[in-house]
């Protein structure tokens, strides 16, 4: 039987070490993701090391996942799992991905604030986009004390939100989110907008309230300054705004196509047929176009408007009630002809 000398054993051992190191390098450097585009993994506050492995594994390459699984299981990663939205690039190996997860090197995201009608709807959107629970968000937005800390009440809180897109972290806390929105609101209004509102003797909240009504009246941005001028004329008369969108909001029946006289008696501070002045707060998150339409309103002497009978989304304006009745009759006739109830 052939005997191996000590040098042979050293060669075998060295070869074994080289093989092991080669495997380590392969497993650590082989891309984790099997996709050829950036993938995102969302680590929640109830995740464990096993669930993290499962989440990454859903988009992972077998060899790359072997290395990542080894690193996660044989380290103290499970003792402090960092929440967040993590980008996994196509060429990133197990060691790089593990380091990002371990150190909490998450990737920010663009959050767009939608122009929704209710805070329930906003909470739902934010709950789907962020780590936050929608019920928790809604509770805060309907809590008087929480709103007052930000300088609002439950009627005006919609004015806090400027419908822009913001670079934000997926795992942001609710308090930090609201404070961020407050900073963005102040930045949006500071300067020219704030000065114009003051010259009009309106607060930013009041501008947002009127803008929200105008947004609901038309999607035609070019016409919004005209509508703003008409409503401002009514406020200065003073006359009730008589804005149909406020009736829909009061009834929470946003799908209504026609506002009949029987609906005008709804007992609500948002009923601008029964109450003079602006309603208590915005009836939706006002658009930037709507806000700027109020601040740059067209000066004219119109007091009435009615949707055009051609259903173009624009309006006929009138100076007198008699002229307005003629416009309203034409529009009502067009509705009847189309059997719109």
Give the location of each predicted region.
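Generic detector of intrinsically disordered, low-complexity, polar/charged segments
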Residues: 12-13, 81, 148, 310
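Signal peptide-directed extracytoplasmic domains
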Residues: 27, 31-189
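N-terminal type II signal-anchor transmembrane helix
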Residues: 1-39
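Pocket-edge positions in alpha/beta enzyme catalytic cores
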Residues: 14, 41-44, 89, 199, ...
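Bacterial extracytoplasmic/cell-wall-associated proteins, especially those involved in peptidoglycan
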Residues: 112, 124, 131-135, 146-341
């Amino acid at each position: 039987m052939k005997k191996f000398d000590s040098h042979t054993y050293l060669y075998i051992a060295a070869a074994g070490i080289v093989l092991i190191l080669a495997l380590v390098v392969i497993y650590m450097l082989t891309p984790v993701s099997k996709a050829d585009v950036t993938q995102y993994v969302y680590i929640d506050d109830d995740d464990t090391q096993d669930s993290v492995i499962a989440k990454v594994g859903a988009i992972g390459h077998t060899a790359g996942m072997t290395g990542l699984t080894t690193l996660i299981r044989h380290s103290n990663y499970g003792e402090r799992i960092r929440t967040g939205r993590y980008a996994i690039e196509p060429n990133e190996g197990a060691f790089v991905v593990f380091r990002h997860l371990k150190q909490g090197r998450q990737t920010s995201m663009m959050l767009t604030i939608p122009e929704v009608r209710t805070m329930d709807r906003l909470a739902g959107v934010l709950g789907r986009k962020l780590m936050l629970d929608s019920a928790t968000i809604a509770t805060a937005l309907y809590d008087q004390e929480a709103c007052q800390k930000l300088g609002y009440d439950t009627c005006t809180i919609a004015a806090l939100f400027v419908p822009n897109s913001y670079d934000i972290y997926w795992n942001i806390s609710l308090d930090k989110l609201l404070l961020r929105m407050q900073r963005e609101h102040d930045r949006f209004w500071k300067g020219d907008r704030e000065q114009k509102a003051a010259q009009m003797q309106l607060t930013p909240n009041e501008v947002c309230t009127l803008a929200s009504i105008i947004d609901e009246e038309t999607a035609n941005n070019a016409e919004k300054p005209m509508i703003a001028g008409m409503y401002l004329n009514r406020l200065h008369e003073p006359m009730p705004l008589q804005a149909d969108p406020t009736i829909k909001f009061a009834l929470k029946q946003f799908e209504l196509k026609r506002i009949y006289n029987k609906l005008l008696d709804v007992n609500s501070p948002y009923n601008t047929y029964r109450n003079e002045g602006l309603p208590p707060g915005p009836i939706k998150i006002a658009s930037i176009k709507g806000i700027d339409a109020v601040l740059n309103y067209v000066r004219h002497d119109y007091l009435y408007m009615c949707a055009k009978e051609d259903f173009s989304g624009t309006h006929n304006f009138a100076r007198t009630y008699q002229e307005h009745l003629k416009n309203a009759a034409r529009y009502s006739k067009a509705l009847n002809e189309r059997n719109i109830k």
